[in-house]
Amino acid sequence: MSRPSTPLLDKAPTPDRLRALPEQDLPQLAEELRTELIDAVSTTGGHLGAGLGVVELTVALHHVFNTPYDRIIWDVGHQAYPHKILTGRRDRIRTLRQAGGLSGFTKRAESEYDPFGAAHSSTSISAGLGMAVASELSGEKRNVIAVIGDGSMSAGMAYEAMNNAGALDARLIVILNDNDMSIAPPTGAMSAYLARLVSGRTYRSVREAAKQVAQKLPKFLQDKARKSEEYARAFFTGGTLFEELGFYYVGPIDGHNLDHLLPVLKNVRDTQKGPVLIHVVTQKGKGYAPAEAAADKYHGVNKFDVITGKQAKPPANAPSYTKIFGTSLIEEARHDDKIVAVTAAMPTGTGLDLFGEAFPKRVFDVGIAEQHAVTFAAGLASEGYKPFCAIYSTFLQRGYDQVVHDVSIQNLPVRFPIDRAGLVGADGPTHAGSFDTGFLAALPGFVVMAASDEAELRHMVRTAAEYDEGPISFRYPRGDGVGVDLPERGSVLEIGKGRIVREGTKVALLSFGTRLQECLAAAEELGAAGLSTTVADARFAKPLDHDLIRRLAREHEVLVMVEEGAVGGFGSHVLQFLATDGLLDRGFKVRALTLPDIYQDHGKPDAMYAEAGLDRTGIVRTVFAALHRDELGHEALPTPFRA
């Protein structure tokens, strides 16, 4: 299929070439950029809606500012695809989120035009402020621009950074990309005129002169003059909150109208003092009818047909773990009216959208605010409710102090369903669920579980619902289950007890999580090589099943622990117990298979697990090495001595 014609975009592969184009050509360039973006993402999948919404803004920023000397920081990075196309990466844009291809987010190692990596929200203003202060300390006249969406403004970190920027009077430009119309809509020509007026040098010079005069007046008149100016600007433009934080507010302006964007950006570029916030209103999915009509469905997309907008969906072998969690929680909530659910802006991603349909008054979406979500859940638990605080593994990191201080130390029975455990594929290291087992199992009294399949997940939801002795978590991966039979309702598991899945005599494989299927496949291969193999499902990283571990150690020659997590997790806890219990004193062979001690780049999950040695081949290879056998399973002969 031929690619769309883009004559102007072809002439502007980098921002310096873009800046050479006359302004009257920029609307056409924006349309070509939008067409190229749609065509590229239709072949790769990815985050489409946010990028479509900032096409004109991206063109305007690179036309007005001297990138990469001037820094543009994209919060989260979902909206950075147009930026990548314009900054020398167009030839690789159809490798987005593929192994060896472009990242789906901004990445410092990828381009000098990406001054700061992103993927988690609300970090851009803090990073930008650091860069702005560094520029000032170095005596450089560099512009630093942080582009942040209104959704990211629900996180307290954004306001912490703005408060600090205002106190420092730093020369920082923040662009608030309001794509949900959640603050205020632009009101046509008058709004654009006022934005251009108040961002200009003349207005700001007069305003500064008036301040100097006012300082010579009695204090009560100074206060009246200041408030009169604030009220007048707030009446026409809004922005009082940002002004209180020390920012000079401009907007709202139409983020799809280059005639409105360009003069405001130029005015702000030429301002020499203080932090400025430009309020830009955009539309997610702009310019592509299917995305405009269903912005939520086009936030993140699979490959799709450009003409119809229909997304390709791979056939599912079983329900997804996320769906199993959602339906299982609904079943438990039917039996217990104390069960409530909390999500931090991810109801669909965590399966709580299903719960919300069944129990709309018992689900709480707190926005992008994981710290608040955890302590909010702790408050619910303190009053006798049973909160399930469902957060992706990678995002739970953002609320760890609250997990420790507000939940664990007080031993409050908050339930933590941890989605996206292990590797997540195309989203790469920023979204991998590598660390939750380690950082939760380190906490006294915290129960830490991992589901090996979808039936086990259903049991763990029931177990968590019934457990009131303290905090409890259970982790599960992205994607579909393995296709096991599902009970209508889960059973309550005995806390700290695993299970034997396959009996053997020589080798023991102890799995924590969904690598269990690979362990079973490895056991078949090992058995074919004459190595009788036991496979056990640990279920719990804390408390450990000491009886099970002792049995595996005493009855086998080799024990291999397998987990979808970083060093310092389940395997480390097992090794600590083996050492303390004296089970290593007789030369017992133990190996721990974890994710490698690196940040693995994006790719297909199966390939990434193979690279990590966590597939059947890697498990078999580890056992052979422990027993000094070659790749065929034959006992390796000692190397003869040579004089």
UniProtKB/Swiss-Prot annotation:
GO terms for molecular function: 1-deoxy-D-xylulose-5-phosphate synthase activity; magnesium ion binding; thiamine pyrophosphate binding. Belongs to the transketolase family. DXPS subfamily. NCBIfam families: dxs (TIGR00204), PRK05444.2-2 (NF003933). Keywords: Isoprene biosynthesis, Magnesium, Metal-binding, Thiamine biosynthesis, Thiamine pyrophosphate, Transferase. It catalyses: D-glyceraldehyde 3-phosphate + pyruvate + H(+) = 1-deoxy-D-xylulose 5-phosphate + CO2. InterPro entries: Dxylulose-5-P_synthase, THDP-binding, Transketo_C/PFOR_II, Transketolase-like_Pyr-bd, Transketolase_BS, Transketolase_C, Transketolase_CS. Homodimer. SUPFAM superfamilies: Thiamin diphosphate-binding fold (THDP-binding), TK C-terminal domain-like. Its EC number is 2.2.1.7. The keyword Transferase applies. Pathway: Metabolic intermediate biosynthesis; 1-deoxy-D-xylulose 5-phosphate biosynthesis; 1-deoxy-D-xylulose 5-phosphate from D-glyceraldehyde 3-phosphate and pyruvate: step 1/1. Binds 1 Mg(2+) ion per subunit. PROSITE patterns: TRANSKETOLASE_1 (PS00801), TRANSKETOLASE_2 (PS00802). Mg(2+) binds at D150, N179. Thiamine diphosphate binds at H78, A119, H120, S121, G151, S152, N179, Y288, E370. It comes from the Bacteria. This is 1-deoxy-D-xylulose-5-phosphate synthase.
